[in-house]
Structure formats: C-alpha cells, structure tokens
Amino acid sequence: MSDEEIDISTALNNKTTPKKKSLKRNSNSQEGYESPEEREIVYPSVFGAIGTPMAKSDNAKEWDEWKEKERKKDKAEWKRYLRSKWDMTQGHLPLVSDSEFLKGRKEHKEYNSKARMDILDGLDEVNEGFFNCGKGAAMNIRYNDKNVSKKGAKKFVATVETAMKKAGNPTMEQMMTDDLDEDEARAEAEWERQREQRKLASRAYDAAMDEREDDAKYVPWDEYCQEMEELGKELKIGEKHYKKWLEKKMDENKVTHKFNAYQLDLKCLDEDAFSNKKSLKSVVRNVQKFYRKMREPKK
C-alpha cells in the first residue's frame, strides 16, 4: 500500500469534517474606503513624461475615451466611499428623534389627517343637505366621533333658534359683516389709543429736548452778571457797562462760538453797534483785505 492510499484511508476514517477554506476580504466595511480625492491620477501616454508641459494629443479619440473612463471611475469610487460612510453610521442613527420640535410628529400628522377627513365629511353632509334640513327638521350632530342624541340635538337647535330670534334673525351675510364691523371698529379704537399714546410720548420728548437745549444755550447776560458778582461790582451792572463788556468780550473771542452771541446782544442793545470797527462786518472786511494782500504778487 502506497503512502497516498494510507493518507486517503486516514482522511476517510477521520470523524472531523475538514474546514472549508474561504477567501477573506482584505478591507472591512467598518473601516471605510479611501477618499477619491487621495487617489493618484495616472495620465495617458499622450501627456508624455510627468512634470513636463502637457503635450498636444494627436489622437483626440484616445483623450476622450480616457476622460470618460476617469469620470466613470471617479463616480464609482465616490459612490462606494459615500456608501461606506453611510454603512458606518447607519447602526448609530436614533430610531426616535430627541429634538423637542420633532416629538410627537407622527401623532400630530395623524390628528391633522383625521381632522381633515372630518371636515371633508362634514362638507359632504352639508352639500347633500343632511346637516341642516330646515326649521323643525331632525339634525344629526357628531361630537368626538360620537353621535349626539336626538334630545341633545333638539336642545341645541332650540338654543340656536332662541339666540337668532334675539338677534332679529339675521342672515349669514349680515352676521359675517356685523362681526367684521365690530372687529374693524375695535381695531380702529385700539389704533387711535396707541396713536394718542405715541403723540403724548412725542410731546413729552420734544419738551424735554427743548428744556435741555434751553439749559445748554449760552446767555451772555448770565455770564456778565456772574462775573460782576465774583468781582464784587454788583452795583455797576447796567446797560452801558454791559455794552462795554460785550465789546471787550468780542475783541477777546473772535474765533470762538460765543462771538455770535455777543454780537446779537450788542445789536439788540444798540442798532448802531455794527458801525463800530469791532463789529462782525468790519472784522470780516479786514480779514478779506488781509488775504487779498497775501494773494497779491510780491514786487
């Protein structure tokens, strides 16, 4: 007996079944695929050596075929890459959303669809004439998917008829317009009330601003009286002395914001004050002469 026969016999007498050798995948789906952006592009031979300027292709068909092949390859790789990303996160997606804005959305959708169907059924009944068949007729009323008893329906009809009699049995159009008129009058009254409030607030703001401007307004007479009191010359306070004080201050404050205030007070006291050499007109004229002399060519 040969060695091969011995090996076969031992294999047959062995109770354990030999293991089946299967090909194992090198990559795991949980590990994911390499991003297509990291793939190295192999250019066709028409480009020449890598690093040299692009050569002009003599065969345009070869170039188009290569572009189409690369496009399909990129599309397949992107699809495989994105699919692997989805497989990795698919098991971790929450079955129920934790967002407070999405809680109970299924129940909300069911309630909406149910209410919509109830409204459609009610409209069908109204159109078919089953809801309100006239005075004294039987009325079928459903509330929360339950039929109201005939006694309750008659009581409801009697209550409605009593309210209509008190209102003078108005038509549907009159009731609609009356409600609109009441709402419009209410809205106009509210708008008028808000308008009066805005008016009062605006007047109070304007008064406060005027008072602030008056407080901030410069008054030469107040400065004159304060200065004379500090010097102890309260008895000399008068119109003639005030004129001299204004002329002195005008001479000292030719380039300040107080100059105009001094000028106006002096004009109110003496109409002939502007004939003085210290007046604003004479000062402006002297400044103009000065600049005119400066512009003249030097001899």
Swiss-Prot record:
GO biological process: eggshell formation; prevention of polyspermy; spermatogenesis
UniProt-recorded name of the protein: Spermatocyte protein spe-11
The protein's role, per its UniProt record: Paternally sperm-supplied factor required for embryogenesis. Plays a role in preventing polyspermy possibly by promoting the formation of a continuous and cohesive eggshell chitin layer.
Tissue: Expressed in mature sperm.
Disruption phenotype: Worms fail to complete meiosis, form a weak eggshell, fail to orient properly the first mitotic spindle and fail to undergo cytokinesis.
UniProt keywords, alphabetically: Cytoplasm, Developmental protein, Differentiation, Spermatogenesis
Main location: cytoplasm
Chain positions covered by the region annotation Disordered: 1-38
Gene Ontology CC: one annotated term: perinuclear region of cytoplasm
Domain of life assignment: Eukaryota
Compartment(s): Cytoplasm, Perinuclear region
Source organism per UniProt: Caenorhabditis elegans
